Swiss-Prot record:
It comes from Pseudonaja textilis textilis. The keyword Lipoprotein does not apply. Serine protease inhibitor. Does not inhibit plasmin, and does not reduce blood loss in the mouse tail vein blood loss model. Gene3D superfamilies: Pancreatic trypsin inhibitor Kunitz domain. Belongs to the venom Kunitz-type family. This is Kunitz-type serine protease inhibitor textilinin-4. Keywords: Disulfide bond, Protease inhibitor, Secreted, Serine protease inhibitor, Signal. It is found in: Secreted. One of its GO terms (molecular function) is serine-type endopeptidase inhibitor activity. GO terms for cellular component: extracellular space.
Amino acid sequence: MSSGGLLLLLGLLTLWEVLTPVSSKDHPKFCELPADTGSCKGNVPRFYYNADHHQCLKFIYGGCGGNANNFKTIEECKSTCAA
């Protein structure tokens, strides 16, 4: 096999490893972050994944800032973090 073919194979294997979870309990690292209301004073109902309780919970988001553990729907939260 040529060196170009080996590099392509190595790249594909690396991509596959990154995209394939080890188990069904794996989730993105941001699912471990705490709920963060952000720096604004809004009153926006959102959901976050509570890693201690292994469930999606409602919180009030201020409308700006915060972190990635912030979902518009409970379904989006569950499919991202609790699947």
